[in-house]
Amino acid sequence: MVAEVAPSFVGQFGPAATPDKVKAALKLIGFADVVEVGWGADRGTVEEVHHYAKHVATGEARFLATSCCPAWSVMAKNEFPEISQSLSQAYTPMVETARHVKKTHPDHKVAFIGPCSAKKLEAMRRTIRSDVDYVITFEELMGMFAAKDVDFGEIEGEPFADAAPEGRGYAVSGGVAGAIASGVHKLYPEVEVKMDRAEGLANCKKMLAIAKAGKREGYLMEGMACVGGCVAGPGTLQPINKATAAVNKFKAESPIDLFEGEG
């Protein structure tokens, strides 16, 4: 089985549980390999950069709303069906990464490890259930580490190098829209990016109501069900500010230039 870990995993399991040690610990308890979900986030970012510049900024499409948060996207589709076509059509990072893993490890199952209980419902969708076999929250994983007596102080780490800063930044509020806007600025410097974002479903509904009224034409809109982003998900273990700082540090450490060779 291969573990795909959401970007918000950083710092969740205590100060000794550095990213490289979490990867090693997952292998220690039985996973054959470990992949950053940030890899899939990067793929989605590139797709959305081109879509915004070619279709939204030109007026062909009304606006582009992110879709990686399942609680937000399901709410948008259910309560604002007339604008649901403006939600990003890119696969969510979980699904994009899982499909990649199934290609590189065809005989393995995939377990998504993250902060989000809504991902359990996403993984049950008919079009996704063959890609993601299991969903485990950080809280549940901590129980597995405890059951296996994992001591992060005694583990030798194994470095991660799957995701660019953009994908790793998806874990915090503003990170998704920020990644897309950064890509547009780099690849389409002549294009102005208009942005709006909301945290918490009540605020997300207000943002969508404004868009429905025609007041967000040409915008890039990010919705996050959890205030603070994925680092505030129901399956997390650390305070939001502490988790956000850890994610930002991990983001800055990425050696990958996502937009090198793009254009």
Question: Predicted segment positions?
Answer:
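Iron-sulfur-associated redox domains of electron-transfer enzymes in respiratory
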Residues: M1-G263
